[in-house]
Amino acid sequence: MKRQRATKSAAQRHAVPATNGTALAERAGRPPRLIYTLLEGRGLLELAALPLLLPILQATPRGDGHPVLLVPGFTASDATLIGLRVFLRSRGYHVATWGLGQNTGFQRKFTQALEQKLRYLHHRHARKVTVVGWSLGGVYAFYAAHCAPECVRNVVSLGSPMRFTANTDQVPLLVKALYRYFAHPMGPVAHLSHVRGKLLQSPPPVPSACIYSATDGVVPADAARIDGRHGQHENIWVPGSHLGLGFNAAVMWVLANRLAQPEGQWRPFEPQGLLGEIYERAAKLARTI
């Protein structure tokens, strides 16, 4: 009985849905700390450290070969997904990217094309697809899972603005300016407010995870998590920047764990072994920041 309580406690600390949606939404309205935004260049350090950590990542569980669809972040293209693509292929997955060029905002032409690609991969492989999206790509991933849940095995967001509201003050000025330039003169709210409402009211009935960083300088941690409305959603913390999430060894470690679960046998994220102990200690430290 004692061991069961300890396991539950660990799961609650790192991989359980937020229970107070109102409080989470209120905190999601705050912008990221300026110091985190100014230090986003540390993503280059995460990229530089990745080759040194590859031997550890090669010890992560191999997958069963099911297809994985990757979606890039805002203003980014498939080229930014090379780290995730190479790693997931090394774990045995059939990896595809969205193939739609630069992500210039949440737009109908992209949502329709992404859903078509999701259905195509499902048909081609005769297996359900895991959809992983970085930043704005995570909103696309959840939206696609909402539109075609019968095709989706898991959906994972990486530092995605899942809970931005109509309060534009929470959006960093640079992001706001880029969105106005590439997508819409009104900024992110023009496209995303109605999408978020739909996602939060009726999340896809598939296993889902929001991976977030407490020191994200673009999307604040509370905005990158969502309130779980079913028993298979989890919010998972990782250390790092926003711009480095696609090359972050901790992200890859978590993804390998989540994607390797047998289909239909979902369990919450529970760090194991030496890396698990290090993760636990780092998570405790992060809560004091």
Tell what function each PLM region has:
Residues M1-V68, L81, V86, R91, ...:
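Flexible, membrane-associating and regulatory peripheral segments of lipid-active enzymes
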Residues G29-P31, P61, F142, P205, ...:
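N-terminal hydrophobic alpha-helix used for membrane targeting or insertion
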Residues R62, F106, V132, R163, ...:
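Residue-level signal for alpha-helical context at structural boundaries
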Residues P204-I289:
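C-terminal catalytic-base region of ester-bond hydrolases, centering on the histidine
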Residues L47-L50, Y120, R180, H184, ...:
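A structural signal for alpha-helix termini and helix-coil/disorder junctions
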Residues H66-A79, G83, R89-P205, I211, ...:
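Serine-dependent carboxylesterase/thioesterase catalytic core
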